[in-house]
Swiss-Prot record:
It comes from the Bacteria. The lineage of its organism: Bacteria, Pseudomonadati, Pseudomonadota, Alphaproteobacteria, Rhodobacterales. This is 2,3-bisphosphoglycerate-independent phosphoglycerate mutase. InterPro entries: Alkaline_phosphatase_core_sf, BPG-indep_PGM_N, Metalloenzyme, PGAM_B_sf, Pgm_bpd_ind. Mn(2+) 2 binds at residues 13, 63, 437-438.
């Protein structure tokens, strides 16, 4: 029996299952295609959080973690747990990259500028890491200025008024907060350089809103109607900006939302906006590798670990062709993260990236670029690829806005595109796995507070088999089981490094 062609992995980013949950966008939306698939096709559920995806117990999953595990076909120990352990056992403070950073600033007489997301969300960073780094650097006699990036997306929308007092109280002598900036500005990943420029100007030139303390900055932002994600870049107290001989240390451990602001800080020929005032840094340090290019500009505390024989690499070794597709908001996930942190495409791997719409927030255009993604999806099915991996960003990106009606529209847009792709797949004689990397839009109201819920969830996600072997069923599992399942459908052997198991029974 010949393998179906193409075999498709369709990831509905942020589409979880929560039958009892309030404000469940997928259930409330008009989604006839997904309704039909769940009623007529083999389906099961996947776990996307905690140790099943290489995270600490109870830690919610995210798109980086999800796509890394999906592509690896094994549980990958993620950076959050590795960093936590290093702080606990004391090896973080002794790390040669960190001690080298400290030594260079001692020699230059400069200040260490620490920047990172100031919440306990654990998706991009963690306040515990900020505090540990500040203690290590200030404890060595180097003055520390913290550029605190408020979250409001992976935690409650208005929780900085809780995080900031605790953070200020925990900072050691010799460390203070210099700026407070919403992640909307400091952690953009879709080339909204006007936003990044405002964060840059506050950090580098000490220009922006002003407040006497971080707590006052948050209170003023709330008075302006801003939630944590959108806090306007604010300069704290007498912070006067960066100077020659200073150092920069980015504490975020997830790459995609750190790249742009760090590019502005370090790229020699940066021209997305005028980087006037950028000092001659004595040292530049990153918690992790942010990209191959960034590795040329920053020393790294925790270098990336090679993941051998990912799904993409293994399919390429069989001489087969594959296609990766997502709009720009999720493009790194179906390429860089799915390929185990490798930037360069595999042999025979083609990619396409429609631009995400240029709107302030995606509730204003919940369809995002789903139609363009669907156009390319259908074309790829018709083009004869062996493997197609596509990500629909809408359920996650619109779910993060907390707008239920917009999230329902997002789900409907994705459902429509999925229907078009399935029609083309039936003609081609292919097979598809429909799933998600984590939950989000199925819980739009916080069941504990009754307020808006904008974060990811611990809910299971669906996994659906379309066009599989006759009589097949699916077993429940975890994200690491998806690559083995895809290889099963493609009639390919599973590399020994993949310890996941096919879900097909």
């Amino acid at each position: 029996m010949t393998a179906p062609k193409p075999v498709v992995l369709c990831i509905l980013d942020g589409w979880g299952l929560d039958p009892d949950g309030p404000a469940n966008a997928p259930l409330l939306a008009d989604t006839p295609v997904m309704d039909r698939l769940m009623a007529t096709c083999p389906n099961a559920t996947l776990t996307t959080f905690g140790p099943d995806v290489g995270l600490p117990s109870g830690q919610m999953g995210n798109s980086e973690v999800g796509h890394t595990n999906i592509g690896a076909g094994r549980v990958v120990a993620m950076d959050l747990g590795q960093i936590d352990l290093a702080i606990e056992d004391g090896s973080f403070a002794r790390n040669p990259a960190l001690t080298g950073f400290i030594d260079r600033l001692k020699s230059s007489g400069g200040t260490a500028h620490l920047m990172g997301v100031a919440s306990d969300g654990g998706v991009h960073g963690h306040t515990d890491h900020i505090i540990a780094a500040a203690k290590a650097v200030a404890g060595a006699g180097v003055p520390v200025v913290l550029h605190a990036i408020t979250d409001g997306r992976d935690v409650a929308p208005k929780s900085a008024d809780r995080f900031m007092p605790a953070l200020e109280a925990a900072l050691p002598e010799g460390a203070r907060i210099g700026t407070v900036i919403g992640r909307y500005y400091a952690m953009d990943r879709d080339n909204r350089w006007d936003r990044v420029a405002r964060a840059f100007v506050a950090m580098v030139r000490a220009q922006g809103e002003t407040a006497e303390s971080a707590q006052a900055a948050v209170a003023a932002a709330y008075g302006r109607g801003e939630t944590d994600e959108f806090i306007a870049p604010t300069v704290i107290g007498g912070y006067a900006g960066m100077r020659d001989g200073d150092g920069i240390f980015c504490l975020n451990f997830r790459a995609d939302r750190a790249r742009e602001i760090l590019r502005a800080m370090a790229q020699p020929d940066f021209d997305a906006f005028d980087p006037a005032g950028l000092p001659d840094f004595a040292a530049k340090l990153g918690m992790v590798s942010y990209s191959d290019e960034h590795d040329g500009w920053f020393d790294i505390v925790f270098p990336k670990r090679e993941i051998v024989n990912t799904l993409g690499a293994w399919v390429a070794k069989q001489g087969l062709r594959q296609f990766r597709l997502a709009e720009t908001e999720k493009y790194p996930h179906v390429t860089f993260f799915l390929n185990g942190g490798q930037e360069t495409p595999e042999t025979g791997e083609d990619r396409f990236m429609p631009d995400s719409p240029k709107v302030a927030t995606y509730d204003l255009q919940p369809e995002m670029s789903a139609e363009e993604v669907s156009d390319s999806f259908v074309a790829a099915i018709e083009a004869g690829y062996d493997l197609i991996v596509v990500n629909y960003a809408n359920p996650d990106m619109v779910g993060h806005t907390g707008d239920l009606e917009a999230a329902k529209a997002a789900c409907t847009a994705v459902d429509t595109g999925l229907g078009r792709a399935l029609a083309a797949l039936e003609v081609a004689g292919g097979a598809m796995i429909v799933t998600a990397d984590h939950g989000n839009c199925e819980t739009m109201i916080d069941p504990e507070t009754g307020g808006t819920h904008t974060a990811h969830t611990l809910n299971p996600v669906p996994v659906i088999l379309v066009g599989g072997p006759e009589g097949a069923t699916l077993a429940p599992g975890r994200l690491a089981d998806l690559a083995p399942t895809i290889l099963h459908l493609m009639h390919l052997p599973q590399p020994v490094e993949m310890t996941g198991r096919s879900l097909i029974r």
